Amino acid sequence: MPPVSSNPPSAIRHPPSGRRLIVNADDFGRSHSINEAVIRAHREGILTTASLMVNEVACDEAVALARENPKLGVGLHLTLLCGKSALLPEKIPGLVNARGEFSNRPVGVGMRYFFKRSLREQLRAEIHAQFEKFRATGLPLDHVNGHLHLHLHPTVFRILVEDAASLGIQRLRLTRDCLSRSRRMAHGHWFYRVSHAAIYEWLSRRVRGPLQQHGIRHAQITFGLLQNARVDEEYILKLLPELPPGDSELYSHPSLDEFKHEFDALVSPRVKEQIGKLGIKLIRYQDL
């Protein structure tokens, strides 16, 4: 893999007058419904990138679809909880059960990964295995993020930064959303919004320095983090005029079943029309 660029993040390199937006779908490869939604949202709508779960049942289908749609930027959706492992259970017994499944309890997982030093080399091995599975697809690595944003967990992030050059990490999601904008664009779920905004702000503050030091690029802000699976047409229409200058990401989970409202939003003619009227440029992470 090529060495990580030493250039600073694009938000510094680009003039402040322009507004550029990455529109990403997480969980690519998790199911046929999600795969279909991702490809249709890319072909028919505003979706520019998707994050691949390399250990899930529909991964091969997702890779084939991505090859048929080379303008879709595909990144790695690193999975270290609520999913399956790349390595066999006997290789990482502290991370998974006998079926190779990570825990479904985010708080407990976060505490164990932070405090149990004995798990760090197992985490490193699993992280490298998932990157190797992505590399085997032959797809260019557009970006890296984590399932339930675990890529910014202090222990996981340290491994990613330490091994960035060998893993080929050049672009990564910064999990920072704006609570004040979120309050203007949607209502309710205040405990979720406030608590998650505080966590994401703390995480983003502590990783910005290392990201810049290692030349790992990122968007300035990621919208949709505080929506709790409600990135619908109404939210996006309110968001677009509020986009700050520079580079932003809109985070989504489109599918044709459970989250069809998010798919519908991404292919909405009203949304596409507003993007054109506002002069917002749709980009991929590799365009940063």
Task: Identify the residue ranges that each predicted region occupies.
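Terminal accessory/targeting
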Residues: 2-22, 32-143, 154-288
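Alpha-helical and His/Cys-centered functional microenvironments
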Residues: 151
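DG-centered beta-turn motif at the end of beta-strands
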Residues: 25-28
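Active-site histidine-anchored catalytic micro-motif
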Residues: 145-148
